[in-house]
UniProtKB/Swiss-Prot annotation:
It comes from the Bacteria. Homodimer. InterPro entries: THDP-binding (IPR029061), Transketo_C/PFOR_II (IPR009014), Transketolase-like_C_2 (IPR055152), Transketolase-like_Pyr-bd (IPR005475), Transketolase_bac-like (IPR005478), Transketolase_BS (IPR020826), Transketolase_CS (IPR049557), Transketolase_fam (IPR033247). This is Transketolase 2. Belongs to the transketolase family. The active site is at E413 (proton donor). The keyword Nucleotide-binding does not apply. It comes from Pasteurella multocida (strain Pm70). Its cofactor is Mg(2+); Ca(2+); Mn(2+); Co(2+). Mg(2+) binds at D155, N185, I187.
Length: 668
């Protein structure tokens, strides 16, 4: 029987060999954390390699994602569908083993990690989801949700500010099933961290309210084993296990230095490591005995079967709850969703209201949350401004309301967004979280990660323009809406009234293949009249709101607008119409969605031969030339805003009927 060290060495040499073959990568972290991983994965981790999507599996997140060969080695050795050939294709085009772990490639990878600090933050989201789902569905004697979230992280993760946001909240919420392993090796890319990272990490996390187990020898399996047992015994606080490790452990000449952090060791050093660790096997060769001891398939199948029996007993005792649990973990919408949500939209169209779109958003939440118990909302300390609370909101606390449906994220925009991604990845919830659009900047990378991972995170942004007014340019978005539109696989909506707002929310809920950004105003907006056909076309991202004649070839001019500027476009069209100009107005609440429509529909809205076009949006002007062409005009922002009442600002920056008409006449 192989020793624990030999089992860990299998990770080390797979990592060394794969990085060497790829001619790039990070061998140091996998070599340094191999002993910790061996104990966690073989003694504690509840998982089934034959079914990576088992609902009650433990979640493992590698926050220091540059050490990706660690998780790839673990998945391969324990029996997931990740072959030795897949490891040989590390970092190659279209492989299952990209340079950083990516969700949806290798089975068993729970989240995409790489930008440091986001993995630990995703892990907080996973742990919130587990605890909340457990309190919503578990009943005495029927614990169908009962799993841990384990996360590996390094110095870089703890230096990133997002780790403070996430770990502070995790302590406040008492996430007792979150267990983090800190790879305390004192090395980062630039060298020994003494010159730039001297925090007392133990005191830092104790101040957050975490249970901290310090000074664990990360190469001593007995100490690691005991630390995990202690961590599992503490059920009211998250645990940080501080593991003293040697980066590149086993490399005689490069261990404990930054030389092994982010580059192949080299053939000579790998040969020296083989001799040092007494590993007599060829590259990518693992003895059958070691494979047998690592294989977790049988153990995992037994564990899942036992859970299925528990679920069957639960279904017998609580059939309605069991059906609801199954629906939610399968990410299926309620049977009445389509009809009820459409009825709500039609009701709004039939009952006009001139309200701020942020208020329209709250009304949509109120209507939809009653249909969607999986909604898990929140705001970054701006609930009264973002209007994200509804009549059934139940804020989650560490002990009280652990079965709630709303998270007070505090002033943590980046943390909130990455936590939402963890909640979405976990399953059972549709997370939404809000802040001012300007503060999206703090969270931009987490929004991008949601899009990359194709997760249904709903990012709500209010106070969307200079319409914010007196708070001034520090709080007035200019380029933010366009920046969001440029993120691949993110659908960005900027609705013009309560109807478009409700449609945007509906589209976001129904979109399973990616996130949405929902952008709303502070100021009131007039509701637009629509025919049934126009109402149906709102969901297509852009549509003709004002026709000038039956024949689509007839317009002299097309005005394109979004959000608060749609009303302005309609008023300008009335003035031009009175002067004999045939004007079509296109409302385009989502350029992303409109661009995905078939060519015939896009041509019906924006006929290519009608080149006289003006776009109107209280955001950066440059974005709109893709629609109006170089000969067109854009009424938009080309500078930062000012501190003044909103009506004065709109006039100052040219968002007036007179200016829109003047711009139109320049090209007529």
């Amino acid at each position: 029987m192989a020793t624990r060290r030999e089992l860990a060495n299998a990770i080390r040499f797979l990592s060394m060999d794969a990085v060497q073959k790829a001619k790039s990568g990070h061998p140091g972290a996998p070599m340094g954390m191999a002993d910790i991983a061996e104990v966690l994965w073989r003694d504690f981790l509840k998982h089934n390699p034959s079914n990576p999507h088992w609902a009650d599996r433990d979640r493992f997140i590698l926050s220091n994602g540059h050490g990706s060969m660690l998780i790839y080695s673990l998945l391969h050795l324990s029996g997931y569908d990740l072959s030795i050939e897949d490891l040989k294709q590390f970092r190659q085009l279209h492989s299952k083993t990209p340079g950083h772990p990516e969700y949806g490639y290798a089975p068993g990878v729970e989240t995409t990690t790489g930008p440091l600090g986001q993995g630990i933050t995703n892990a907080v989201g996973f742990a919130i989801a587990e605890k909340t789902l457990a309190h919503q569905f578990n009943r005495p004697g029927h614990e169908i949700v009962d799993h841990h979230t384990y996360v590996f992280l390094g110095d870089g993760c703890l230096m990133e500010g997002i780790s403070h946001e996430a770990c502070s909240l995790a302590g406040t919420l008492g996430l007792g099933k979150l267990i983090a392993f800190y790879d305390d090796n004192n090395i980062s890319i630039d060298g020994h961290v003494d010159g730039w990272f001297t925090d007392d990490t133990q005191k830092r996390f104790e101040a957050y309210g975490w249970h901290v187990i310090p000074a664990v020898d990360g190469h001593n399996p007995e100490q690691i084993l005991e630390a995990v047992k202690q961590a599992q015994a503490e059920t009211t606080k998250p645990t940080l296990i501080i593991c003293k490790t040697i980066i590149g452990y086993g490399s005689p000449n490069k261990a404990n230095s930054h030389d092994c952090h982010g580059a192949p060791l080299g053939d000579d050093e790998i040969a020296a490591a083989r001799e040092f660790l007494k590993w007599e096997h060829a590259p990518f060769e693992i003895p059958a005995e070691i494979y047998a001891q690592w294989d977790a398939k049988e153990k995992g199948q037994v564990a899942e079967k036992a859970w299925e029996e528990k679920l069957a007993a639960y279904a017998k005792a609580y059939p309605e709850l069991a059906a609801e649990f199954t629906r939610r973990v399968n990410a299926e919408l309620p049977a009445n969703w389509a009809a009820e949500s459409q009825a709500f939209i039609e009701h709004l169209q039939a009952n006009p209201a001139n309200i701020a779109s942020r208020k329209a958003s709250q009304n949509a939440i109120e209507a939809y949350a009653k249909l969607l118990p999986e909604f898990l909302g929140g705001s970054a300390d701006l609930a009264s401004s973002n209007l994200t609370l509804w009549s059934g909101s139940k804020p989650i606390r560490a002990v009280e309301n652990a079965d709630g449906n709303y998270i007070n994220y505090g002033v943590r925009e980046f943390g909130m967004s990455a936590i939402m991604n963890g909640i979405a990845l976990h399953g059972g919830f549709i997370p939404y979280g809000a802040t001012f659009l300007m503060f999206m900047e703090y969270a931009h990378n987490a929004v991008r990660m949601a899009a990359l991972m194709k997760q249904r995170s709903l990012f709500v942004y209010t106070h969307d323009s200079i319409g914010l007014g007196e708070d001034g340019p520090t709080h007035q978005p200019v380029e933010q809406t366009s920046a969001l539109r440029l993120i691949p696989n993110l659908e960005t909506w900027r609705p013009c009234d309560q109807v478009e707002s409700a449609v945007a929310w509906k589209a976001a809920v129904e979109r399973k293949e990616g996130p949405s950004a929902l952008i709303f105003t502070r100021q009131n907006l007039a509701q637009m009249d629509r025919t049934a056909e126009q109402l149906a076309n709102v969901a297509r991202g852009g549509y003709v709101l004002r026709h000038c004649c039956e024949n689509q070839n007839c317009p002299d001019l097309i005005l394109i607008a979004t959000g608060s500027e749609v009303e302005l476009a309609m008023k300008a069209a009335d003035v031009l119409d009175a002067e004999g100009v045939k004007v079509r107005v296109v409302s385009m609440p989502s350029t992303n969605v409109f661009d995905k429509q078939d060519a015939a529909y896009r041509e019906s809205v924006l006929p290519s031969h009608i080149t006289k076009r003006v776009a109107i949006e209280a955001g950066i002007a440059d974005f709109w030339y893709k629609y109006v062409g170089f000969e067109g005009r854009v009424v938009g922002m080309n500078s930062f805003g000012e501190s003044a009442p909103a009506d004065q600002l709109f006039k100052l920056f040219g968002f007036t009927v007179e200016n829109v008409v003047a711009k139109a006449k320049e090209i007529l």
